[in-house]
Amino acid sequence: MALSLLGIPADDPKARIAREFRYAQGESGTGSPGRAIVLVANKTAAGSEPVETLGEPIQDINDCFVRFGRRSEIAHQYRALRMVAPRATVYAVAVAENGTAAASTVTFTFATAATGSSTLRIDWGGRRLEVGIASGDSANAQAAAFNAKVNADPDLPFSGSVSNGVATITTANLGPRSAQLLNALRVYYAVNVGTTVSKGSVTAGTGADDYTNALAALGTTSIYYHAPACTAVSGVTATDGGVGQYCQFIRDQAAPAVGKDQQVIFGLDCTQSQGTAVATSSAANLVRAGFYRVQANDWTSAMVAAHMAGVRWLKEQAYPAASLTGYANGDGTPFAIPDPYDKTKRPSSTEVTADLNNGVTPICFTPLGGPNLDRGITSYSVLPGTANKDYRARESHIPSAEDAAWEYLYQRWITTRQPNIAGDPRPGARPMKGFNTPGGMKRLVNSAIDVLTSSASPFDNMPILDPDPAAVQRMRDSVYVEQRADGIGVSVNWEPVRHDNKDDFLILQGGPAY
């Protein structure tokens, strides 16, 4: 067969070592330590970092505060990520806010004077602040105390003002996404003291940000895990300036002519049907994308994305084929996404099934509120150009394992590659020094398969390609090498390891009747 890679003409004169991944090529069926993470979200004016530029890695939380602002979206992403991946190399690109954007706001109205002593509780983002209320405190005094408490905390992503017993809370960042910050804000009395505090409707910010320039900045480098703050609740497109365009960027960057191995991780705060609409959009139907869904959560979708990027890094940086099945908070596996305040917003069994069949990974919760994953999947679930479901590249480790396998093969090739090309030597003749041959290339690829399917694998001494003997033989049989006028073409069908996701036990009760 004539082997060609997408986007690279057969007569392209430039020297190269290129690769193309074609996923879902098998039979139909129903990081390394060098991997880094980039956060792509909003800063505040307090941060010194220029927008839409990629600077040095973030050194620590104080460096993050100085460069992006302590109340910023990036700062809260950084905190969420560091809970699970304290050693990861983390970059950030600040997305410029829309020039006409407005902040989100909400009011809290205090009704009357307190008839006794109590504590006013302020819950946000998994944190609780408390304000002492004394008997006789007027509505305005209570509102002022609440407002002062909010403004005194430098880590909250909003600030307040007060007038006539009404406190108005305004987000630090602008645009419609900032409404998530206020949706999760709860204020209430620990003990009823003859008054109330009423939360008004959240007025969502306006003027969505556009990721186009930030993506241009990211196009100058290669960072494995991307955790953007952009999110969606409906279908996306490849030119929408947000989720769909980000997916298209990752797709384009992975093309053979560019050759960057990257993945993008999004957070969704929406219903199951809304998540399906996002992930099954043609622009988002991508093996290199992951959508992690919560509903009415105390964390923003941006924080969920960052936390899940940390989880992926933690699991895959040593063993790229790691499973997320059953991932939960435990010794060595931090997982801190909070249980929704409204327990009806936990995903039901039916919703989990629907999510997993439509390219969405739901964040599940135990009856006691512990977060966990049923399994992790990519957003690819539809055969392109059709309405047919395709689950051959569903498991989340597939792009990670194939990227690691390619990196291993690439490193072996560049250390043994010779400057010249020739056909295979005659039977019995010794290979000639300084020449690559089709047979030599085939032996190299088969050797890589043997290593990556055995305990000799450099990835924690565990195979990242399927070690089943039949799978190994299929991979070896799939190797195709062709000699060209000035190079070699190679095709191989790698099969990543398969995870143990489903174990069924049938227990039969025996014994005599009595």
Functional labels for PLM-detected ranges:
Residues 285, 290, 309, 343, ...:
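Intrinsically disordered, low-complexity regions enriched in serine, threonine, proline
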Residues 1-89, 321-514:
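Structured, hydrophobic secondary-structure cores that serve as assembly/anchoring elements
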Residues 60, 146, 169, 298-330, ...:
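Residue-level detector of buried hydrophobic side-chain packing
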Residues 268, 299, 318, 398-400:
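A periodicity- and composition-biased signal for non-globular, repetitive helical segments
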